From Swiss-Prot:
Annotated HAMAP family: MntP_pump
NCBIfam families: PRK11469.1
Gene Ontology molecular functions: manganese ion transmembrane transporter activity
Protein name: Putative manganese efflux pump MntP
Transmembrane segments: 3-23, 40-60, 65-85, 109-129, 134-154, 169-189
Role summary: Probably functions as a manganese efflux pump.
UniProt main location, coarse: membrane
A UniProt-annotated Pfam family: Mntp
Location in the cell: Cell inner membrane
Membrane topology: Multi-pass membrane protein
Family: Belongs to the MntP (TC 9.B.29) family.
Disulfide-linked positions: none
Species the sequence originates in: Proteus mirabilis (strain HI4320)
This protein's UniProt keywords: Cell inner membrane, Cell membrane, Ion transport, Manganese, Membrane, Transmembrane, Transmembrane helix, Transport
Length: 194
């Protein structure tokens, strides 16, 4: 996977965390930079870990589905992208918010980080079938998520839940586009090989 594809994938995967961070930022009385950075750090560490877990699972099963690797990556990306779009549209303009605390609890942030990183784990499964440096890719995903979640917290109270919803929709569309790109690249190479 190219450098630019890795950045685009990381940006797409960080949109879930960004959308949640916007919502979390909107629920805080006044989000401070330290709280935003803490949220970004927690989300980033989790988001960097889950693709590696998924990648390891993918390697374990790769011998059974190597002929369909491009279809697996395509299917996972389309399903996850579609799920992001569906959940965003289903939720509507509502932001799942609480009363305005001064800061969010660590356990709450960890649970939210895990929930938003399940798509990254599934992507990791798909990445096991591609020639990627998983550590570099996971670090890029984690750093992008940290940056986006931190920014989301800081600007959440100003832009509210509407942009958070649009960010999720855009992230879903990008994942679907990457899935089609992987499929078309593989099918194109397959056609030239025969």
């Amino acid at each position: 996977m190219s450098f630019y594809a890795t950045i685009i994938l990381a940006l797409a995967l960080s949109m879930d965390a960004f959308a949640v961070a916007v919502c979390k930022g909107a629920t805080l009385h006044k989000p401070h930079f330290r709280e935003a950075l803490r949220t970004g750090f927690i989300f980033g560490i989790i988001e960097a870990s889950t693709p590696i877990i998924g990648w390891a699972l993918g390697l374990y099963t790769s011998q059974y589905i190597i002929q369909w690797d491009h279809w697996v990556a395509f299917g996972l990306l389309v399903i996850l992208g579609g799920r992001m779009i569906y959940q965003s549209l289903k939720r509507g303009d509502d932001c799942i918010c609480e009363e305005a605390p001064q800061r969010h609890g660590s356990l709450s942030l960890i649970a939210t980080g895990i929930a938003t990183s399940l798509d990254a784990m599934a992507i990791g499964v798909g990445l096991a079938f591609l020639q990627v440096d998983i550590v570099h890719t996971a670090m890029t995903i984690g750093m992008m998520t940290m940056i986006m979640a931190t920014l989301g917290m800081l600007i959440g109270r100003y832009i509210g839940p509407v942009l958070g919803k649009k960010a999720e929709i855009i992230g879903g569309m990008v994942l679907i586009a990457i899935g089609f790109n992987i499929l078309f690249e593989h099918l194109d190479l397959f056609m030239y090989a025969h």
